[in-house]
C-alpha cells in the first residue's frame, strides 16, 4: 500500500548556503569598500555579518542535514587549524588588539569543520570567491584606463593619508589600484581571481573553453597592471605547478609546455611594456631583481626586516615574543612613522613571535594540508578518484591557491593579511572536506596501491 502513497519532495534550503557564502566572502572582499562608500564598517558590524552567516549555516546543517553538533567529526587538518588558533590565543599579550583577527580566524575554522558535510557548499563558496574577485578585476581595468574618472569619483573617498599613497601609486608609478587603498592589496585580489579562473580550465566539458581562456588572460593582464612583481611571480608559479600535477600526460611534455608558456609570457609582457606604462613599470620591477646595481635594494627593505626578526627570535627562541608583537616592536627601528610593519617573511615572523613551538604547529598545518591536496589532485588526475566536475575545479583551486600562499609567505605577509589568510583557510577546508566526503573510496585506493606494490616486490 505504501508504494501508492506519494511522498512529498524533500525541500532543500540551499539559499541559506548562498546567503552565508556571500556574506562570508563579502566580509573579506568588501568590508573596506563599505567603509569608503557606504558606512564605517566597525568591528561590531563585521562580527554581526559573520554571526548571521554562521547562524544560517547552522540552521541549514541542523535542518537539511540533520547534523548534531556533538557528533561532528574533526579531521587531522582541522585539529591543526584549531591548534594554530590556540597558539595565537596563548602567545597574544594584548588580546584586545588582536581580537578582530582572532575571531574571524576562529569563525573560518568553525565553518571549515562544518562545510565538509555538504559538498555543494564547496561549489557555492568557490563561485562567490570568483565573482567577488571579478568585481575588483573589472574595477582595476576600468579605473586604470579611465584615470580621470578614478581621480574624480573614487580617489576623493579615501582619507588624506591613503590619498597621498594612492596619488603616488596611480599618477607617478602607474600602478592599477582598483577599488583598494593600496596596489598591494589590489594585487592580492587579482591573484585570488587568477587562481579561480585557472581552475575553471580543468572542467571536463570543453564548452565555453575559449571564454575561460580569455577570462584567465584578462585577469592576468589586470594583475600585471598592479605592478606587484612578487604576487605576479608566485601566482604564475602556482598555476604552473598545479598544471604539472593536474594535467594528464608525460612529465617531460608538461615541462616543455611550462617553459613555452613562460617564454611566451615574457615576450608578450616585454612587447606590451612599450605601449602600456603600467606593464612597463611591472617589467622594470621584475628585471630590477636581476640587476647588478649594488646601490639598488631589490628587497625593498626586506633584508633589514629579516635581520630584526631573527634577532627577536634569538631573544626568545622557544615561545617567541608574542603574536603580532613584531609589528609593534619593529617601528623602533624606523624613524618615519609608527605604521605596523610585518616581516615580509611569514616563516621568520612565526619563529620570532611564536617561537619554535608555535612555528612547528603552523608548519605542520602548511605541510599536511598541501600534501593532502597534492595527493587528492594526483589521484583525480589518474582517474583513480572519481570527482564531479565542480568538485575537481574546487580541488584544483585549493591546490593552486595553497601553492601561491606558501610561496608568497617567503616575501609577503599572507598569514597576517585578512584577504589572503581568509581564502587560505577556505582552501584548506576544500581539500580536507573533499577527503572526508570520499574517504572510503580513498582508503580503498590506498589499499589497492599497497597490495599492488607488495605483488610487484
What are the residue ranges of the model-derived segments?
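Alpha-helical transmembrane segments of multi-pass inner-membrane proteins
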Residues: 57, 85-86, 126-160, 164-172, ...
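N-terminal signal-anchor transmembrane segment
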Residues: 1-65, 84-91, 405-407, 426
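Long extracytoplasmic/lumenal interhelical loops at the membrane interface
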Residues: 29, 290-354
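Hydrophobic transmembrane alpha-helices and their immediate junctions
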Residues: 76-77, 240-244, 354-404, 440
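Transmembrane alpha-helices of multi-pass inner-membrane enzymes
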Residues: 54-57, 236, 240, 394-457
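Loop-to-helix entry and N-terminal half of a specific, functionally important transmembrane alpha helix
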Residues: 17-27, 211-217, 345, 374-411, ...
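Aromatic-anchored transmembrane helix interface
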Residues: 78-82, 95-117, 123-133
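A membrane-periplasm/extracellular boundary helix in multi-pass inner-membrane enzymes
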Residues: 138, 144-147, 243-293, 310-315, ...
Amino acid at each position: 500500500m505504501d508504494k501508492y502513497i506519494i511522498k512529498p519532495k524533500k525541500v532543500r534550503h540551499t539559499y541559506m548556503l548562498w546567503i552565508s557564502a556571500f556574506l562570508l566572502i563579502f566580509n573579506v572582499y568588501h568590508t573596506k569598500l563599505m567603509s569608503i562608500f557606504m558606512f564605517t564598517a566597525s568591528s561590531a558590524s563585521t562580527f554581526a555579518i559573520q554571526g548571521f552567516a554562521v547562524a544560517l549555516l547552522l540552521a541549514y546543517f541542523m535542518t537539511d542535514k540533520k547534523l548534531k553538533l556533538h557528533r561532528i567529526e574533526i579531521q587531522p587538518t582541522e585539529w591543526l587549524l584549531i591548534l594554530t588558533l590556540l597558539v595565537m590565543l596563548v602567545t597574544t599579550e594584548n588580546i584586545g588588539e588582536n581580537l578582530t583577527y582572532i575571531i574571524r580566524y576562529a569563525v573560518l575554522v568553525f565553518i571549515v569543520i562544518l562545510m565538509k558535510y555538504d559538498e555543494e557548499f564547496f561549489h557555492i563558496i568557490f563561485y562567490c570567491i570568483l565573482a567577488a574577485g571579478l568585481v575588483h578585476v573589472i574595477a582595476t581595468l576600468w579605473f586604470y584606463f579611465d584615470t580621470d574618472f578614478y581621480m574624480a569619483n573614487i580617489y576623493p573617498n579615501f582619507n588624506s593619508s591613503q590619498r597621498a599613497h594612492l596619488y603616488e601609486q596611480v599618477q607617478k608609478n602607474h600602478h592599477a589600484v582598483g577599488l583598494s587603498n593600496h596596489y598591494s592589496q589590489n594585487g592580492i585580489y587579482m591573484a585570488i581571481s587568477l587562481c579561480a579562473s585557472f581552475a575553471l580550465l580543468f572542467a571536463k566539458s570543453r564548452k565555453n573553453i575559449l571564454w575561460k581562456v580569455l577570462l584567465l588572460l584578462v585577469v592576468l593582464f589586470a594583475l600585471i597592471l598592479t605592478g606587484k612583481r612578487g604576487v605576479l611571480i608566485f601566482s604564475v608559479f602556482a598555476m604552473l605547478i598545479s598544471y604539472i600535477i593536474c594535467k594528464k600526460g608525460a612529465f617531460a611534455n608538461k615541462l616543455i609546455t611550462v617553459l613555452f608558456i613562460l617564454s611566451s609570457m615574457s615576450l608578450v609582457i616585454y612587447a606590451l611594456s612599450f605601449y602600456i606604462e603600467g606593464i612597463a613599470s611591472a617589467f622594470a620591477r621584475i628585471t630590477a631583481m636581476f640587476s647588478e646595481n649594488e646601490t639598488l635594494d631589490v628587497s625593498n627593505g626586506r633584508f633589514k626586516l629579516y635581520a630584526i626578526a631573527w634577532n627577536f627570535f634569538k631573544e626568545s627562541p622557544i615561545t617567541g615574543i608574542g603574536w603580532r608583537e613584531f609589528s609593534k616592536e619593529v617601528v623602533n627601528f624606523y624613524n618615519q612613522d609608527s605604521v605596523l610593519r610585518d616581516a615580509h617573511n611569514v616563516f621568520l615572523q612565526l619563529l620570532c613571535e611564536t617561537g619554535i613551538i608555535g612555528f612547528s604547529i603552523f608548519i605542520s598545518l602548511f605541510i599536511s594540508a598541501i600534501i593532502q591536496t597534492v595527493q587528492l589532485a594526483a589521484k583525480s588526475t589518474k582517474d583513480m578518484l572519481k570527482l564531479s566536475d565542480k568538485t575537481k575545479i574546487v580541488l584544483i583551486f585549493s591546490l593552486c591557491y595553497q601553492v601561491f600562499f606558501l610561496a608568497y609567505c617567503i616575501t609577503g605577509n599572507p598569514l597576517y593579511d585578512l584577504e589572503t589568510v581568509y581564502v587560505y583557510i577556505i582552501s584548506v577546508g576544500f581539500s580536507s572536506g573533499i577527503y572526508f566526503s570520499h574517504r572510503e573510496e580513498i582508503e580503498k585506493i590506498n589499499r589497492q596501491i599497497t597490495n599492488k606494490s607488495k605483488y610487484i616486490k
